[in-house]
């Protein structure tokens, strides 16, 4: 019963927060905090129990925990939840960043507090559902459900720039996100239905169960078409070039607290879905199209890095750098290499933590000087306590300096791709020079240089509370632990990632 509890706690907690929306703001906060604390505890229980479970084989059907009850039996749909070590890692990442989101929201949300936590918890609940669903219809339901609360968080609590035209505001950006998400959902639904129908034609069994569908027999043309449909649905939400235009706008005008979930967790569901569904369901077509998709990964890396050089909005800059780093992970996924797979997971987790920290810091900068415009900043190192120092630290971490999880992830990706994709590795390494230049310019413009006279009143202003300070220290410690002792993730993720790699052993 751990899995149903894990997915239901955020939804139930969000509903309770909504009930107390107009009564007591503190009650809503403590309900949200309690809900995420329970999710975190359950995630840790799953992790420790999974480590102690001896799996007899590394087949793709080996789940550490599983829960299944019939739902719509006529169409072969069941409420099928299951986790292996890969999904448990993602659950722990979700619970950690969920707790960070709730902690950081204390006294920062001023209106409709209960409704805010309702949207936040339902977003987190949907993400948890995505990570533990192995019935494709149930997965699709959670995939679509994650869009609505995120959309309303953007509409009601997003940043409103009254000096810009209507198409540069939170409502337009939210609508753009919604449209892209609906296109992604539509393509995913159509591709799923074609896969289910194909399985029914060949095996005369109507089912949405992942464990059954991965054995579907089909010709290579049909498999390629369905695989590309799944890939397109997930690529829109990663996002990769050319499906990326919604992300910078969304980050720019979304609430800082909401960005932690969107950038830190929600976008990573697509990476997880590629590894969980795209590769095991369509191994032959994955191998055929791997080089083309890796080429898109290279384009994404360079495009994100180059465009970020010309950004003057701190949140838009972080968004483009995030897009660039997603290119590295995409290359790792389609390299068909065990070491690169593990590097992708380490990079995914570490980068989620460091990006969440940078977005939170951008909120602190805005609270201090009431602007996200980098060109209007400068000399903040002597004006603000702690914030410039943390900006420098997490920007350097994003460069992938040794001793951090980001470095280990990138190094393993390059090492895994080196033998079979040497040119890809060389181009990727050159892109790191651009990313380093971006990060250094980012820190220099904000923290150093001439002091803007309009910020003289900020001298020694301390906008960072003890709680905020401890959160940044906590995120920093996690990244350093992963960097100094990556076996924490490597050992846990080895079995499921080895299963994915072994799918190709019969025909590569």
From Swiss-Prot:
GO terms for cellular component: plasma membrane. One of its GO terms (molecular function) is NADH dehydrogenase (ubiquinone) activity. InterPro entries: NADH_Q_OxRdtase_chainM/4, NADH_UbQ_OxRdtase, ND/Mrp_TM. One of its GO terms (biological process) is electron transport coupled proton transport. It is found in: Cell membrane. It is a multi-pass membrane protein. Its EC number is 7.1.1.-. It catalyses: a quinone + NADH + 5 H(+)(in) = a quinol + NAD(+) + 4 H(+)(out). The chain crosses the membrane at residues 1-21, 36-56, 63-83, 86-106, 113-133, 136-156, 177-197, 220-240, 255-275, 288-308, 317-337, 343-363, 389-409, 423-443, 470-490. Keywords: Cell membrane, Membrane, NAD, Quinone, Translocase, Transmembrane, Transmembrane helix. It comes from the Bacteria. NDH-1 shuttles electrons from NADH, via FMN and iron-sulfur (Fe-S) centers, to quinones in the respiratory chain. Couples the redox reaction to proton translocation (for every two electrons transferred, four hydrogen ions are translocated across the cytoplasmic membrane), and thus conserves the redox energy in a proton gradient. NCBIfam families: NDH_I_M. Belongs to the complex I subunit 4 family. Composed of 13 different subunits. Subunits NuoA, H, J, K, L, M, N constitute the membrane sector of the complex. This is NADH-quinone oxidoreductase subunit M. It comes from Buchnera aphidicola subsp. Baizongia pistaciae (strain Bp). The gene is nuoM.
């Amino acid at each position: 019963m751990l899995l149903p509890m894990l997915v239901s706690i955020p939804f139930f907690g969000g509903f309770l927060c909504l009930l107390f929306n107009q009564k007591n703001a503190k009650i809503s906060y403590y309900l949200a905090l309690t809900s995420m604390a329970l999710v975190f505890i359950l995630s840790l229980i799953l992790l420790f129990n999974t480590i102690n479970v001896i799996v007899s084989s590394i087949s793709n059907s080996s789940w550490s925990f599983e829960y299944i009850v019939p739902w719509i039996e006529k169409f072969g749909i069941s409420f099928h939840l299951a986790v292996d070590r890969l999904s448990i890692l993602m659950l722990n990442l979700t619970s950690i960043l969920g707790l960070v989101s709730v902690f950081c929201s204390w006294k920062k949300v001023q209106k409709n507090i209960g409704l805010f936590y309702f949207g936040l918890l339902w977003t987190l609940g949907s993400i948890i559902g995505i990570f533990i669903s192995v019935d494709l219809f149930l997965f699709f339901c959670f995939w679509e459900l994650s869009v609505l609360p995120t959309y309303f968080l953007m509409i009601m609590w997003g940043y409103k720039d009254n000096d810009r035209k209507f198409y540069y505001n939170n409502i337009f950006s939210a609508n753009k996100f919604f449209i892209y998400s609906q296109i992604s959902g539509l393509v995913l639904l159509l591709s799923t239905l074609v896969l289910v129908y194909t399985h029914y034609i060949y095996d005369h069994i109507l089912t949405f169960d992942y464990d059954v569908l991965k054995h579907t027999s089909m010709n290579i043309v049909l498999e390629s078409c369905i695989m590309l449909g799944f890939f397109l649905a997930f690529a829109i939400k990663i996002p990769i070039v050319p499906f990326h235009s919604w992300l910078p706008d969304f980050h720019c005008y979304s609430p800082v607290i909401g960005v932690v979930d969107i950038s830190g967790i929600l976008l990573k569901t697509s990476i997880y879905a590629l590894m969980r569904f795209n590769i095991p369901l369509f191994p032959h077509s994955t191998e055929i199209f791997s080089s083309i998709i890796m080429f898109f990964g290279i384009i994404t890396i360079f495009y994100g890095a180059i465009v970020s050089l010309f950004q003057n909005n701190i949140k838009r800059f972080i968004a483009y750098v995030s897009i660039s780093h997603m290119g590295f992970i995409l290359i790792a996924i389609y390299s068909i290499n065990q070491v690169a797979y593990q590097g992708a997971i380490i990079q995914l987790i570490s980068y989620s933590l460091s990006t969440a920290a940078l977005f939170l810091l951008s909120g602190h900068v805005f609270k201090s000087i009431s602007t996200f415009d980098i060109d209007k900043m400068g000399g903040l190192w002597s004006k603000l306590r702690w914030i410039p120092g943390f900006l420098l630290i997490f920007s350097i971490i994003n460069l992938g300096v040794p001793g951090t999880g980001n470095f280990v992830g990138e190094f393993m990706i390059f090492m895994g791709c080196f033998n079979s994709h040497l040119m890809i590795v060389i181009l990727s390494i050159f892109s790191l020079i651009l990313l380093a230049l971006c990060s250094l310019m980012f820190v220099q413009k904000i923290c150093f240089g001439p002091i803007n006279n309009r910020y003289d009143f900020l001298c020694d202003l301390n906008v960072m509370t003890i709680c905020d300070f401890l959160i940044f220290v906590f995120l920093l410690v996690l990244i350093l632990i992963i960097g100094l002792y990556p076996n924490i993730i490597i050992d846990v993720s080895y079995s499921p990632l080895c299963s994915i790699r072994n799918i190709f052993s019969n025909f590569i």
